[in-house]
Amino acid sequence: MAQTALISVSDKTGILEFAQALHALGIKLLSTGGTAKLLADAGLPVTEVADHTGFPEMLDGRVKTLHPKIHGGLLARRDLPAHVAAIQEHGIDTIDLLVVNLYPFEATVAKAGCTLEDAIENIDIGGPAMVRSAAKNWKDVGVLTDASQYAVALAELQAGGKLSDKTKFAFSVAAFNRIADYDGAISDYLSAIDFDASIGQASPTRSMFPAQSNGRFVKVQDLRYGENPHQQAAFYRDLHPAPGSLVSAKQLQGKELSYNNIADADAAWECVKSFDVPACVIVKHANPCGVAVGKDAAEAYGKAFKTDPTSAFGGIIAFNRPVDGETAQAIAKQFVEVLMAPGYTPEALAVFQATKVKQNVRVLEIALPPGGTTDWDNGRNLMDVKRVGSGLLMQTADNHELAASDLKVVTKKQPTPEQLQDLLFAWKVAKYVKSNAIVFCAGGMTMGVGAGQMSRLDSARIASIKAEHAGLSLKGTAVASDAFFPFRDGLDVVVDAGASCVIQPGGSMRDQEVIDAADERGVVMVLSGVRHFRH
């Protein structure tokens, strides 16, 4: 008995060629609406579902395939005599292949100006119903929900006349995953809408925090272990990754990425993306230990490394410009876990292939988005999620950027243009340092970083000690504090270390006391009005 394929797709990529190949194998074609017309116009013999069921499409196409002749043909188990007898009694033919992709709900709601009515009309009913039926009966029915599966299916059909159980099961799992993703997207969209009973319609605005959140991720790879060897781990990505994000990285060489590599690489990449000029960020344990800008990648790296050569050992290095041979030669003198950049010259790649040890360096390439570095803003995470016991904390991501016009000078002494530039640089870096964060900067480079201390005083002292160990003078430096100084003692510590200007959010009950102390010490203080806690 000839096999039958039911084809009904919204995305028609590759479907005509696939249907032609199925026809060449003697497989009968069933189809609906626009798909049927496409196949018929190409000269393929195709039976409309309405002719197959004897029941016309109705309700503006809302009811097409919701019929026993369709679902009976998909759900009937060929190995159960009772099932076979039942479909024969009711004149139901079996369906062996189902090729369906769904109404483009996700693409519709992503469009500017999408209304609730637009969204509702793009909720597929018949497609998911057929997919579930076919996926449930995977031993007898192959269900294809993505054009990427066509080649796999066709190769097996041409080789052996049928799909293997392994392939059918894999397709079934993919189908259920697709339905879960689809229903999750609908739930997320509708859960974020407030219905205004007074006017009988939905609000035109949507909440960023829906009543129910349906996290949907795809596994990229299993990892050797988690943060520690006794922990198991895997790396997942969003269903639709943003351009220029870490998950789009291509590993050009080196060992397999570890859990800690990925966590640190993300911290480095997000920081370096925030600079418009050539920049280098070196990260250790999710904290920047050296950040600098320069005329090119080589200069930026040299300055960043100079901040804290000890901590840079075994670090993660990120650039926002391609790496050339000169820069690679400088990096190769150190032990590096991960190197990441938008690109590499052949000379740079050759440096890391020169010895077996250098071949272990994990070299990642993250292609620039179509709009170049300026388009990286579009690839930032919009939400941050943190797991707590049996729950999640969700917040909008800290993507706030500061301009010179946003600053409020609160001291008698005014900042010079050079000091303003250093203050803005220090503030940008401080956002990526674990709280409590104190960052000394000068000349487009970090001079000392104090991170993750319970006391702001201790962070300031550590930053000063780091600079001393690196042989750097803090005289005349700019200092950023990610949160306000609760007392003047923190200010005194950074000024004693050599700072000439300070940027902090303000907002303390003792702001005036701290400002008066700045005037007393003869330093500049500006307020950002924004806090950058990072935990």
Swiss-Prot record:
Residues 1-145 form the MGS-like domain. Belongs to the PurH family. It catalyses: (6R)-10-formyltetrahydrofolate + 5-amino-1-(5-phospho-beta-D-ribosyl)imidazole-4-carboxamide = 5-formamido-1-(5-phospho-D-ribosyl)imidazole-4-carboxamide + (6S)-5,6,7,8-tetrahydrofolate; IMP + H2O = 5-formamido-1-(5-phospho-D-ribosyl)imidazole-4-carboxamide. Gene3D superfamilies: 3.40.140.20, Methylglyoxal synthase-like domain. Pfam families: AICARFT_IMPCHas (PF01808), MGS (PF02142). The IMP cyclohydrolase activity resides in the N-terminal region. Coiled coil: none annotated. GO terms for biological process: 'de novo' IMP biosynthetic process. Keywords: Hydrolase, Multifunctional enzyme, Purine biosynthesis, Transferase. The keyword Hydrolase applies. Its EC number is 2.1.2.3, 3.5.4.10. GO terms for cellular component: cytosol. SUPFAM superfamilies: Cytidine deaminase-like (SSF53927), Methylglyoxal synthase-like (SSF52335). InterPro entries: AICAR_Tfase_dup_dom_sf, Cytidine_deaminase-like, MGS-like_dom, MGS-like_dom_sf, PurH-like. It comes from Variovorax paradoxus (strain S110). Disulfide bonds: none annotated. It comes from the Bacteria. Pathway: Purine metabolism; IMP biosynthesis via de novo pathway; 5-formamido-1-(5-phospho-D-ribosyl)imidazole-4-carboxamide from 5-amino-1-(5-phospho-D-ribosyl)imidazole-4-carboxamide (10-formyl THF route): step 1/1; Purine metabolism; IMP biosynthesis via de novo pathway; IMP from 5-formamido-1-(5-phospho-D-ribosyl)imidazole-4-carboxamide: step 1/1. The lineage of its organism: Bacteria, Pseudomonadati, Pseudomonadota, Betaproteobacteria, Burkholderiales. This is Bifunctional purine biosynthesis protein PurH. CDD domains: IMPCH (cd01421). GO terms for molecular function: IMP cyclohydrolase activity; phosphoribosylaminoimidazolecarboxamide formyltransferase activity.
